[in-house]
Amino acid sequence: MASCLSLLVAIILCFSSLQCSNAIGKGYRLISMEKSPDDGSFIGYLQVKQSNKIYGSDITILRLFINYRTDHRLRVHITDAKKQRWEVPYNLLRREQPPNVIGKSRKSPVTVQEISGPELILIFTVDPFSFAVRRRSNGETIFNTSSSDESFGEMVFKDQYLEISTSLPKDASLYGFGENSQANGIKLVPNEPYTLFTEDVSAFNLNTDLYGSHPVYMDLRNVSGKAYAHSVLLLNSHGMDVFYRGDSLTYKVIGGVFDFYFFAGPSPLNVVDQYTSLIGRPAPMPYWSLGFHQCRWGYRNVSVVKDVVDNYQKAKIPLDVIWNDADYMDGYKDFTLDLVNFPHAKLLSFLDRIHKMGMKYVVIKDPGIGVNASYGVYQRGMASDVFIKYEGKPFLAQVWPGPVYFPDFLNPKTVSWWGDEIRRFHELVPIDGLWIDMNEINATGHKASLGFKTIPTSAYHYNGVREYDAHSIYGFSEAIATHKALLAVQGKRPFILSRSTFVGSGQYAAHWTGDNQGTWQSLQVSISTMLNFGIFGVPMVGSDICGFFPPTPEELCNRWIEVGAFYPFSRDHADYYAPRKELYQWGTVAESARNALGMRYKLLPFLYTLNYEAHMSGAPIARPLFFSFPEFTECYGLSKQFLLGSSLMISPVLEQGKTQVEALFPPGSWYHMFDMTQVVVSKNGRLFTLPAPFNVVNVHLYQNAILPMQQVVAFPAGASEGYASGKLFLDDDELPEMKLGNGKSTYIDFYASVGNESVKIWSQVKEGQFALSQGLVIEKVIVLGLKGTWKVSEILLNGSSISNETKTIEVSSKEQMYVVGSEDEGESKSFMVELKGLEMLVGKDFNISWKMASTNVLSMAGNEVIAR
């Protein structure tokens, strides 16, 4: 839902001027360093070299805390040695807390200048103090605060101004620092400031700070032909500007501490695994949330919502979740129902109907609570004293209901009150998920600079915490409270969609990218933003398909669903004032939707398995190509294509009037998912121009992968290797936890190989009872990329000849045509073989093999197994 206003707010601390930095501070000297006998951590003290009053007084003595919590994670924490400073609350983002004893600085001799970990080595200089982080494996320096080359100033640490810089190699590729609408793609652009301060600035504005704050970046470098990735997190919730100059990076922060975490990687997947092991693994999502969602601000009554559901059915476009924006509320008041337009009995009848169809219902909640003496939610909130204060009273703001107070989610009483209100509403309306919006916080009706469209930075939270300090964690704290409430009320796996996010939000909520435009540029930017959030640990992400506002041309909506069908979170949503944009509004768009969403629904088991991988290791669902091809430097800046998982590549049309797409194909064989007779082969990796008429989206599966699908499990393997592997996770998706060992989940490893004139496909099942209880079977096998002949003989199923089985197996084949680069050599065609009628139980190990009639079989370029 849009806010009342859309204005650009920027925090300008100091423009990227070297003179400005040098004038601010002269740095610190290290005066002591000691090793803790308990855990091997180090504690040191720093003394300011020369104090001044620019931006306030320097903090005289700082405490330095260093530790290695894992083999691949280093922490460097710098704070005031004499006074406790604000940090992201340890009860919200759980992590090790440095010693909290504030004492006098010691002046013991500094006897070490290097602290070694298994992979990351910390090196520091004494005067002026600086530190560098170096890899043990290749000697590469990944972070270096020394200003010896005078490209930036010394470290500055004042009460309301902190500054620190690092040098960088000019060929480093950086990603992250969001949420930001990056018009130039996912790769950070030198000489652009990146502001981090959660605010309600719509994504209409490009290259600007948006709803979330994620002060983390990934650095990908190619060192002598080998790729190394690492990540750096500055865990700080204050507003900050980050200046990237190509050869250096400077942080300018308006408070808090320096709390740096370094993650060694070395692969991009290693990095997100290490990062999410600290900030929290992404939340497991219910299976239904991976279906298609429809929403609009302006579904003004139950009949309109019912018509939308009916029209999707008539158009034969899949729809799993219907949403209501604030239209269902009484006067925009949270936890209320407009009994005129949404009569309780009529709404319950509608929900009963869609629930029987397997559909779900999600509604919006804004944090602002209407100030109304007859409003029970307000009354109970006042009685429990749950609102943010200003000058001793609840802060009065203006949002949709009129005058509002904002809940203080740092207050334990607020969390309890919020949970009780959700319980009460759920008893009234059996919702399946919640959408928490405008939680940056968004507010209007007062004058401020930094606090414009939010609450004053001098407002305060529980225990006297200033809004100045806690502003950017508001949406995060609300997501935690909402997750706790839904879990308690439903006893099921919660689904929450949040606009504002912070470090760790992915542990509790999905995210959509806010109020975007119905423009071609917004379509392009949606991919970059989606890929960034995978790096941030929020893999369940998507943008408003067809754009939130203004009117969207038919051609654009046509192309947008071809992209949006492959967002991890796939939802069509539009503004109240925009024309209707449901996918059935245009004939050509409906056809594209049936095609693209039809493929998405086939991919649901695959997407759900990616959801499991994300929950277990932080692996993004949607990924940049460099995650799978880190040595292929041509894809480092690629933002117009993306991968789902490690091997499924989407290459959409993103420009008006185009009926073909120029796509980059990393080295190997790629199989078209919509027409498996088409194969793209590139020996060294290159651009290919592919046809892309309306209703066609280029989706390709890479060699050596196994792809579990609805009715299909695909096994492509490489022409040179003849081996493929993959996996499938199944469970009761209502369980709060997503894991093996609970008796209600199954995990399958699939394998396939070609050799000695035979093809073999087999599985290894862990805890198969759940899959057996669901009656799931593999019905069809398709093998792609066979050389020589398609003729199949001597089919064996679990060691027995298929002729001994009572089932009838159908065998068919098609020729595959290759698109081969002009510089490449090799075969120009192959064969795909399909076996139907297998009915192999998913919950039991299976082994199927057959002989090929020709001796010309060389290897398997790809294969596919289909499960029903």
Curated annotation (Swiss-Prot):
Keywords: Apoplast, Carbohydrate metabolism, Cell wall, Cell wall biogenesis/degradation, Glycoprotein, Glycosidase, Hydrolase, Polysaccharide degradation, Secreted, Signal
Signal peptide: 1-23
Glycosylation sites: N144, N222, N301, N372, N442, N756, N798, N804, N847
GO cellular component, one term: apoplast
UniProt catalytic activity: Hydrolysis of terminal, non-reducing alpha-D-xylose residues with release of alpha-D-xylose
Gene Ontology MF annotations: alpha-D-xyloside xylohydrolase; carbohydrate binding
EC number: 3.2.1.177
Location within or outside the cell: Secreted, Cell wall; Secreted, Extracellular space, Apoplast
Principal location class: secreted
Pfam family, one: Glyco_hydro_31_3rd
Secreted is among the record's keywords: yes
Active site: D437, E440, D515 (proton donor)
InterPro entries in alphabetical order: Gal_mutarotase_sf_dom, Glyco_hydro_31_AS, Glyco_hydro_31_C, Glyco_hydro_31_N_dom, Glyco_hydro_31_TIM, Glyco_hydro_b, Glycoside_hydrolase_SF
Gene Ontology biological process terms in this record: cell wall organization; polysaccharide catabolic process
UniProt family annotation: Belongs to the glycosyl hydrolase 31 family.
Protein name: Putative alpha-xylosidase 2
